[in-house]
């Protein structure tokens, strides 16, 4: 049975339920509430109040999202694009990526080691490994350095 989101209390409760599961960005939370039938006139004040109370925090969401995706083996390029698709400002994304203490080179080597564990023997293997790592969100420069055997250790 779907809850009707036609009062400020109902919208706030639905927003808090979503935030209890995981961090959300303002744009994502607004979209989810609209999908559940809440009107923008009710959503904006509810989200403003949650932000004032510290329950909705974009920087905390960015930090959580970046850490989660990095643990999953994704690189900074893919994470940056996913966050932009979720409606977050590019400047905030860049600030969060620069502030995180993730060693992207070590992350790249670990992702590569888990998947392939050996340098490519021919051009076809090198292309295959490169495509996989590029899809994961690592720069071509870092990938090229790794696959040619030059490490920045």
Curated annotation (Swiss-Prot):
**Taxonomically, which superkingdom?**
Bacteria
Answer yes or no on keyword Nucleotide-binding. Answer: no
Write down a Pfam family by its short name.
RecX_HTH1
InterPro entries hit by this protein:
RecX_HTH_1st (IPR053926), RecX_HTH_2nd (IPR053924), RecX_HTH_3rd (IPR053925), Regulatory_RecX (IPR003783), WH-like_DNA-bd_sf (IPR036388)
Q: Does the keyword Mitochondrion apply?
A: no
Q: Which cell locations does it reside in?
A: Cytoplasm
Family affiliation: Belongs to the RecX family.
| Protein role | Modulates RecA activity.
- Assign the protein's first listed, main location to one coarse class: cytoplasm
Q: A cellular component term (GO) from this record?
A: cytoplasm
Give the GO terms filed under biological process for this record. regulation of DNA repair
**Keywords assigned:** Cytoplasm
Query: Per its record, how is this protein called by name?
Result: Regulatory protein RecX
């Amino acid at each position: 049975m779907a809850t009707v989101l036609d009062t400020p209390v109902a919208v706030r409760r639905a927003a808090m339920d979503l935030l209890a599961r995981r961090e959300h960005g303002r744009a994502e939370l607004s979209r989810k509430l609209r999908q559940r039938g809440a009107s923008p006139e009710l959503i904006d004040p509810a989200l403003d109040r949650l932000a004032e109370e510290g329950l909705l925090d974009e920087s905390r969401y960015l930090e959580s999202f970046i850490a989660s995706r990095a643990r999953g083996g994704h690189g900074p390029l893919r994470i940056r694009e996913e966050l932009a698709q979720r409606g977050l400002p590019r400047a905030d994304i860049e600030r969060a990526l620069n502030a995180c203490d993730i060693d992207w080179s070590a992350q790249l080597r670990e992702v590569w080691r888990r998947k392939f564990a050996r340098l490519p023997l021919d051009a076809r293997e090198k292309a295959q490994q490169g495509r996989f790592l590029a899809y994961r969100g690592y720069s071509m420069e870092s990938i090229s350095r790794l696959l040619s055997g030059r490490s920045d250790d």
